[in-house]
Regions:
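Conserved helicase/translocase motor-coupling segment
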Residues: 1-37
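A cross-kingdom feature that marks ATP-driven nucleic-acid transaction machinery
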Residues: 30-202
Length: 202
């Protein structure tokens, strides 16, 4: 667990093959299920063919594992530093630390979506020959009879290329599309932009 903060930003997706050439998900499945059910991690599975039944196309051998307690993640990330506890949190609050905000922000959103009753899914497809097919969506949820893609942005983002590609490719299956970021509510180009704290309302 102490290595978790170090690994989270390096590999967004956890591949079982990283454990060894002959590693198979079925050999480690019970361990991942235990971590998820013990609320130590929030597992997020790749939905390879997104539809209302996200579980039907979920690839459990490729998953993201978010820490279930973001406060614990931040504490573990800096527990070996020179900061006293109060100094650390003050530095985080006032943006005086050079940290991977994207990693922590995505972890916060995963925690809020799980607390809101959603199972976590994402979409990832790599295609070096056809750039239009190369994309990654941070989270997918279902709303009524449609899927809703969610992109999480930290800092001053300027584009959402993967979300645009996803909306073109799966336009018949998508209802609302969301970007969660650190600014006010607005709608741009058919995408609903919401402050990060509103993830709990989705």
């Amino acid at each position: 667990m102490t290595e978790y903060p170090n690994n989270l930003p390096k590999k967004k997706k956890y591949k079982i093959s990283s454990l060894g050439k002959t590693a198979r998900f079925r050999s480690y499945e019970d361990s991942f299920v235990w971590l998820n059910e013990a609320m130590i991690v929030n597992a997020c599975f790749n939905a390879t063919d997104p539809s209302v039944g996200l579980a039907l196309s979920s690839d459990h051998s490729t998953q993201k594992c978010y820490m279930a307690d973001t406060g614990l993640l931040v504490t573990q990330a800096f527990m070996s530093g020179k900061y006293t506890e109060n100094d650390l949190y003050r530095s985080v609050l006032f943006d005086k630390l050079n940290i991977n905000e994207g990693m922590i922000t995505e972890n916060v959103v995963a925690q809020m979506l799980r607390a809101g009753g959603h199972r976590l899914y994402f979409y990832s497809r790599s295609d070096s020959r056809e750039r239009e097919n190369h994309m990654e969506i941070d989270f997918l949820i279902t709303q009524k009879n449609r899927i809703a893609p969610i992109e999480v942005k930290s800092g001053n983002y300027r584009s959402h290329i993967s979300l645009d590609k996803f909306r073109r490719r799966f336009s018949q299956k998508i209802g609302k599309s969301y970007i969660l970021y650190d600014k006010d509510v607005c709608v741009k180009d058919g995408i609903i932009h919401l402050p990060l704290y509103m993830a709990q309302l989705l």
